Amino acid sequence: MPELPEVEIIRRGIEPWVVGHIIQRAEIRNNQLRWPIDQEIISIHQRRVISLKRRAKYLLMQLHHGWIIIHFGMSGRLRILAHMLPPEKHDHIDLIMSNNCILRYTDPRRFGAWLWSNNLDKMSILNNLGVEPLSDQFDGHWLFTKSRNKSLLIKQFLMTNKLVVGIGNIYANEALFAAGILPSRASCSLKEQEALLLARSIKAILLSSIEEGGTTLRDFLQSDGRDGLFAKKLQVYGRHGEPCYTCGEFIQIAKYGQRSSFFCPSCQN
């Protein structure tokens, strides 16, 4: 599933090709994604894109009369085509742009969504989202304060979107390793210095992934079709039974909240 870094990479990749340009029309080949595509998107005609923003794992495309809200689900991706190519089986949506490029949405599992809103403030899926981990608001003090009365395991805390958005399983594992904290620790057990280090680690891991083009494990590709290279920097995620690069101890795996957690029993405590 694309997490915050992957969605931000897609946003940056397609922004120069769509912002300031006009959507001439949409070609919808499959209306049945996670939810049916709104008629406003299906019938879009000659509408200029004003801005392209990201909130959590949502892309927000602003037009003069409303917003297209895109969520990538498990396997969705967007790419820019310099000219029309024959669509393949899972190419469900094209936005035909005035600059002769095509914005193509591909989603093999069809868990993604294309939604429409006249007013983002009234979108319930956005209203209950937590703090952005790359914002100034998110820091060690915030993390320490918010975790005081939480019985959640720290890994689950980091993946609760009502608290903090977009970190996801891969980056939660990597950040906890970087901070030397076991995923099974109760969030309320964090000491203030641990919270400061964890917040810094989260920011550093997310920014590093963005710089490397994200993490390609299965479906994710950048908007130009390239793989993300952060997978080569993973320290614990997906490395069960392999030696830790730092200490040589074998990476272990456990399930908390039905999600796999990878950790080094020596480097993390």
Swiss-Prot record:
Cofactor requirement: Zn(2+)
Q: Which GO annotations describe the biological process of this protein?
A: base-excision repair
Give the highest taxon in the source lineage.
Answer: Bacteria
Active-site residue numbers: 2 (schiff-base intermediate with dna), 3 (proton donor), 57 (proton donor), 259 (proton donor)
Q: Write down the chemical reaction(s) this protein catalyses.
A: Hydrolysis of DNA containing ring-opened 7-methylguanine residues, releasing 2,6-diamino-4-hydroxy-5-(N-methyl)formamidopyrimidine; 2'-deoxyribonucleotide-(2'-deoxyribose 5'-phosphate)-2'-deoxyribonucleotide-DNA = a 3'-end 2'-deoxyribonucleotide-(2,3-dehydro-2,3-deoxyribose 5'-phosphate)-DNA + a 5'-end 5'-phospho-2'-deoxyribonucleoside-DNA + H(+)
In the record, what terms sit under GO molecular function? 8-oxo-7,8-dihydroguanine DNA N-glycosylase activity; class I DNA-(apurinic or apyrimidinic site) endonuclease activity; damaged DNA binding; zinc ion binding
Mark the FPG-type zinc finger spans by residue number: 235-269
Read off the CDD domains from this record: EcFpg-like_N (cd08966)
Supply the EC number(s).
3.2.2.23, 4.2.99.18
Key word Ion transport present in the record? Answer: no
Manner of cofactor binding, per the entry note: Binds 1 zinc ion per subunit.
InterPro entries linked? DNA_glyclase/AP_lyase_DNA-bd, DNA_glyclase_Znf_dom_DNA_BS, Formamido-pyr_DNA_Glyclase, FPG_cat, MutM-like_N-ter, Ribosomal_uS13-like_H2TH, Znf_DNA_glyclase/AP_lyase
Q: Which UniProt keywords apply?
A: DNA damage, DNA repair, DNA-binding, Glycosidase, Hydrolase, Lyase, Metal-binding, Multifunctional enzyme, Zinc, Zinc-finger
The residues that hold DNA are 90, 109, 150
For this UniProt entry, which segments traverse the membrane? none
Q: Which cysteines are joined by disulfide bonds?
A: none
- One Pfam family named in its UniProt record: Fapy_DNA_glyco
Homology family: Belongs to the FPG family.
Q: What does this protein do?
A: Involved in base excision repair of DNA damaged by oxidation or by mutagenic agents. Acts as a DNA glycosylase that recognizes and removes damaged bases. Has a preference for oxidized purines, such as 7,8-dihydro-8-oxoguanine (8-oxoG). Has AP (apurinic/apyrimidinic) lyase activity and introduces nicks in the DNA strand. Cleaves the DNA backbone by beta-delta elimination to generate a single-strand break at the site of the removed base with both 3'- and 5'-phosphates.
HAMAP family cross-referenced by the UniProt entry: Fapy_DNA_glycosyl
Cite the PANTHER family for this sequence: FORMAMIDOPYRIMIDINE-DNA GLYCOSYLASE (PTHR22993:SF9)
Q: How does it assemble?
A: Monomer.
NCBIfam families from the UniProt entry: fpg, PRK01103.1
This chain belongs to which protein, by name? Formamidopyrimidine-DNA glycosylase
Protein species of origin? Baumannia cicadellinicola subsp. Homalodisca coagulata
Q: Which gene encodes it?
A: mutM
